[in-house]
Amino acid sequence: MKLRVRLQKRTQPLEVPESEPTLGQLRAHLIQDLLPTLGFSSDTRFAITLNNKDALTGDEETLASYGIVSGDLICLVLEDEMPAPNLPSSTDSEHSSLQNNDQPPLAATSSQANIPDEQGSDSSHGQVTQYDAWTDDSMEGPSHSAEAVSIQDAMSVEEASGFHPLEPMLCSETEDGQVPHSLEALYQSAGCSTVSDALIVLVHLLMLESGYIPQGTEAKAASMPEKWKSSGVYKLQYTHPLCEGGSAVLTCVPLGKLIMINATIKVNGGIKNVKSVQLKPGAYVRRAEPGESAAKVYKDLKKLSRLFKDQLVYPLLAFTRQVLNLPDVFGLVVLPLELKLRIFRLLDVHSVLALSAVCHDLLIASNDPLLWRCLYLRDFRDSTIRGPDTDWKELYRKKHIQRKEAQRMRHVMYLPSVHPIPFCPIPVYPRPYLPTTLLPPGIIGGEYDERPILPSVGDPVTSLIPRPGEPPSQFRPVRPRFDPVGPLPGSNSLLPGRASPNNRFPFRPGRGRSADNRLPYL
């Protein structure tokens, strides 16, 4: 709870962490936190008041029992400045007035501080939470200048603390645990016995928020129309100031765990079905005991307000005006051109083109040259100075095509190449190891035997070939068993058909004689 505390024309904010603080806890926080900051010792004796006159007693009493809520102003009066005769009588009368009232009065705002109360002491106790001076006939209050200074001080502290205890006015403004005052009054007056009754009360309030007026009854704003439910079926009739000559009827039928809401209009003696929506009462209404507050019964009011109005209320109003041959009064189409262009500027080009296909009015607005100039400068950052006769839409189209083409070419350029087929006859990549010797390929002992180059690079066989500086592998290097270009094994260039003396395949001698190792006689 956040409070404002004033002592000798100085106001300071004070935060009480307890959920339901008592007067004694407030006094302890004042002694520990506030008095040292104002230059007083912790032994300073003071009285807690709401009007600088009547002291509050009873440390066990909660602040709520005195009608103190978050944001109120608490006035501290030092003991030597407190008039003694006022303490017992005012305290007793204050307790009696609080006990006689069923509900504690709410805190008055700072704008009510200057309003004099001339109805006697009984009425003044009903406004016990008001701060600043009291103009009583039997007691002299502070001067007007002191009142003005105190009001300005309180307003400045309230603005500095950033605390504004405001209740929601519409269902779309609510949070969990909050309901508008109008919904609270409707719920209490309707006497709901089921969750379906509570949901229909909420639907009726949403129709009232949209400008519909109950028809055929003299229902007040804080009560439901007459005969709104009969034999388990709910029926609500409305008129709208923008649809003179037509009326809307909502027929709500419970179907198990759902409620079907059918909207029809009556125009020129005929009835036309417009829209229907299904709602689940359990999603927005809690089961509660009779007499519970509406804040404990309803939930997700913001979601239901958006869903119900977008799917039923606004289409119903637009269709009714269309049947009555009346022009549109709301929506994007009826906005001035300036507002349309400001909205279109926030969209991308695809959304603008989609809106241009809706109707003729939006087509004209979407072809505005100023709009396309803004879109062009936003999307392309072109600093070229162009003449007033520039077709910005056509320029945007050409620039957009160029950008798409450049993106496509960039995508093709950076595409990874396909892995080459193993042993491809035409290598895709250049060979990493080119022979440095001048000998033709295939010579035994050349670089070809040291690092045989296969037709393709990157095939699975090449990865098994050890390179210079690499550790030996368990796979032997792939190399030819004989020279494919040179003579065949066992051949002799001097004596064809005879093996050379140091050949790996010596000539096999005939049976019964040794080999003839003599050189031939030339």
From Swiss-Prot:
This is F-box only protein 7. The modification Omega-N-methylarginine is found at residues 431, 451. Substrate recognition component of a SCF (SKP1-CUL1-F-box protein) E3 ubiquitin-protein ligase complex which mediates the ubiquitination and subsequent proteasomal degradation of target proteins and plays a role in several biological processes such as cell cycle, cell proliferation, or maintenance of chromosome stability. Recognizes and ubiquitinates BIRC2 and the cell cycle regulator DLGAP5. Plays a role downstream of PINK1 in the clearance of damaged mitochondria via selective autophagy (mitophagy) by targeting PRKN to dysfunctional depolarized mitochondria. Promotes MFN1 ubiquitination. One of its GO terms (molecular function) is protein heterodimerization activity. Residues 92-129 are annotated as: Important for interaction with PINK1. Residues 129-169, 381-522 are annotated as: Important for interaction with CDK6. InterPro entries: F-box-like_dom_sf, F-box_dom, Fbxo7, PI31_Prot_N. Pathway: Protein modification; protein ubiquitination. Residues 87-114 have a biased composition (Polar residues). Residues 329-375 form the F-box domain. The modification Asymmetric dimethylarginine is found at residue 518. Part of the SCF (SKP1-CUL1-F-box) E3 ubiquitin-protein ligase complex SCF(FBXO7) formed of CUL1, SKP1, RBX1 and FBXO7. Interacts via its C-terminal proline-rich region with DLGAP5. Interacts with BIRC2. Interacts with CDK6 and promotes its interaction with D-type cyclin. Interacts (via the N-terminal Ubl domain) with PRKN. Interacts (via N-terminal region) with PINK1. Interacts with PSMF1. Residues 1-88 are annotated as: Ubiquitin-like. Keywords: Cytoplasm, Methylation, Mitochondrion, Nucleus, Ubl conjugation pathway. Residues 180-324 are annotated as: Important for dimerization and interaction with PSMF1. One of its GO terms (cellular component) is Lewy body core. PROSITE patterns: FBOX. A motif (RFDP motif) lies at residues 481-484.
